[in-house]
């Protein structure tokens, strides 16, 4: 799938250098879909990713969750807690931020794909 089919592209222009759409930030590596669980004032969001992990001893799956800190560009400031977003790996932006929010997922996109 192409990126434009998964996310809603930003409608407004921004002057953020760390924006993957309007700035000079290159996205490479892993892409994850997750839920925004916390939004800070300093352009930071915390994303929760839920995955299934196979336990061979019990022959069952268990849910495991990972929380990732990501950078939120100015043009995507309408994203709020509870929204599902797509994030991409990039160069280290700070001590804890190595991912950037690419956009809000469109309705009907499954999180497990």
UniProtKB/Swiss-Prot annotation:
The keyword 4Fe-4S does not apply. GO terms for molecular function: rRNA binding; structural constituent of ribosome. CDD domains: Ribosomal_uS17. GO terms for cellular component: cytosolic small ribosomal subunit. InterPro entries: NA-bd_OB-fold, Ribosomal_uS17, Ribosomal_uS17_arc/euk, Ribosomal_uS17_archaeal, Ribosomal_uS17_CS. GO terms for biological process: translation. PROSITE patterns: RIBOSOMAL_S17 (PS00056). Keywords: Ribonucleoprotein, Ribosomal protein, RNA-binding, rRNA-binding. It holds the Pfam family Ribosomal_S17. One of the primary rRNA binding proteins, it binds specifically to the 5'-end of 16S ribosomal RNA. Part of the 30S ribosomal subunit. Belongs to the universal ribosomal protein uS17 family. This is Small ribosomal subunit protein uS17. It comes from Nanoarchaeum equitans (strain Kin4-M).
């Amino acid at each position: 799938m192409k990126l434009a089919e998964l996310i809603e592209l930003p409608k407004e222009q921004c002057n953020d250098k760390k924006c993957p759409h309007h700035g000079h930030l290159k996205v490479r590596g892993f892409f994850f879909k997750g839920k925004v669980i916390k939004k800070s004032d300093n352009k930071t969001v915390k994303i929760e990713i839920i995955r299934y992990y196979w336990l061979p001893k019990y022959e069952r799956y268990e849910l495991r969750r990972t929380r990732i800190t990501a950078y939120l560009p100015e043009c995507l400031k309408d994203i709020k807690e509870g929204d599902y977003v797509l994030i991409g790996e990039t160069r280290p932006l700070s001590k804890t931020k190595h991912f950037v929010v690419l956009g809000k997922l469109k309705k009907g996109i499954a999180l497990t794909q």
